[in-house]
Amino acid sequence: VAPAPDDAVLAFPAERIADWSTAVDLAKIVAGPGPAVTADDRAQLRADLTELTALAQDEVQGFTGLTAGGPGARAWVMGRGDWIRRNTVGLQRLMEPLAVRLLEAKPDRSAIARKALGAQVGSILGYVARRVLGQYDVFLPADDDGLIYYVGPNMIDFERRYGLEPRDFRLWVAIHEVTHRVQFGVAPWLRGYLGGLVDEYLGSISIEGGALTGQLRHAVDELQRDRSAWEGLGGVLLLLTPPQREIFARTQAMMSLLEGHASYVMNEVAARSVPDLARIQRALAERRSTRGVEQAFQRAIAFDQKVAQYAAGERFVREVVARGGQDALNQVWSSSSNLPTRDEVAEPARWVTRVGG
């Protein structure tokens, strides 16, 4: 698959609500180019990941008993700039329904407002682009299904920084991302379900001027009545309406499952095929314990909450497997009605009783 051209980010009408060129330019500045990598190192990384992605698919399918339809998983080793451009296009696709409503209400959106939103998007994308190792993009067009992104500079930087054996680390990353490919391959309805949640949430956002003020006033009143009800949930929930909180809960439960399952499979498969696994896990824990400005930014984007959410998902998967084996767990991919609720993620026995018993 050829890299997206630089002007691809301007191909969608959603460009009228944000300056996407500003987003891309700022993201590249924030991300930086990454470490210096020789042509030989780049070629070896591509060769390794092409081979290891195919190997990972065999390992994941053999371990889980799940067989993904469609094309096999394919590797695209890219730089930070390519990753930023691809994800900017994805964000535009997701924001299109909201963009239409905003432009209907206020077609003359100012250049300052567009640049401000572009700068916000760019700062977040740039930060993530410095850290992301691999990604299975669930919102790719159908003809790109199976494509897995690997951010080459980040992978090489991580290997060097922590003294890891390259092929072991590359296989470890591939196993995680290929697991996501298998999830969406064995359950084609997942892509539409996730997209539906995004559309449902964006459709619920009020574009009336006083709506946010009213929600904030209601949230403050609710917090004063019961402060403990919001502990650990994140301040963002204070500004959500009851229907939005329900959408948020379903999305959170689904992401807990997807990431928890990927972590479980990655760790179990890697335990028998990645000799350097213990050192990789220590390196990952060390990176997550970062301090200073980076930690403050992680808090601002609720990174710690996401890590805790995914850990809860892995606990859910492990308990279901312990109770009923892989066959019980694999029922979760049959239909959206079999997805765990947020409460069931916290108490897996409830899901087993409802679905997997």
Question: Where are the predicted features?
Answer:
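N-terminal low-structure segments adjacent to metalloprotease catalytic domains
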Residues: 1-93, 311, 323-357
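Short pre-active-site segment immediately N-terminal to the catalytic Zn-binding motif
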Residues: 154-173
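Pan-zinc metallopeptidase signature
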Residues: 238-357
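Hydrophobic (often cysteine-bearing) scaffold residues that line and stabilize catalytic clefts
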Residues: 52, 121, 166, 171, ...
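Active-site recognition of the HExxH zinc-binding catalytic motif
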Residues: 169-185, 317
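Auxiliary, metal-adjacent structural segments of Zn-dependent hydrolase domains
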Residues: 52-153
